[in-house]
Amino acid sequence: VLNRVIDFMLSYSQSNLNPEEIVLKEIFEEILNDYSHIFDQENIKVDSSFPVQLKLTINKQFFRDILQNLIDNSIKAMANAKTKILKVSYEALSNNLVIKVSDTGVGIPVERREQVFALYYTTTQDKGGAGVGLYIVKTRVESLKGTVSIEDSEFGEIGTTVKIVIPFKN
């Protein structure tokens, strides 16, 4: 955890120094591939939807940090779930990139949905959570002029959906 905080602080200080053009589908697939052994080991079914080939000029490491932290959280949240499904998608709406990461984990009660973005707030301490991941997601998304929110789960009564909206120019 300390290493993640230090890495975060170092890369944050370099924030927008290195924006580069990325192909979203490639980044999403690369990150999901990085986790494939964990998905197999934990018996997690991955449902991904990347319907459009979209290029974005953005800090690549910030973008990776966002996705990796959301996936890490989903894996922890599904540790004791009977059905383990991770759904990752993006779409372009107007001049916004809308990313959704959903899981069939324990879920987040409505009254705690704002709290989870605070530094050191965790509901998964017993699974190694330190309350840093969603804080990193929030600060990274905000540095990209975007918003992040917790929505009702796409899976009904179980799980969580995190929605990120990042503006871009066509």
Predicted feature residues:
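Acidic ATP/Mg2+-coordinating residue in the GHKL
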Residues: 103
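Conserved glycine-rich
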Residues: 146-147
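Short beta-strand/loop element within the Bergerat-fold HATPase_c
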Residues: 83-95
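Conserved polar catalytic motif of the HATPase_c/GHKL fold
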Residues: 61, 68-73
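Conserved DHp (HisKA) dimerization/phosphotransfer helix of two-component histidine kinases, i.e.
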Residues: 1-38
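Detector for a conserved hydrophobic position within an alpha-helical segment of the HATPase_c
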Residues: 141-142
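Short conserved segment of the HATPase_c
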Residues: 108-120
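Conserved catalytic submotifs in the C-terminal HATPase_c
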Residues: 40, 45-55
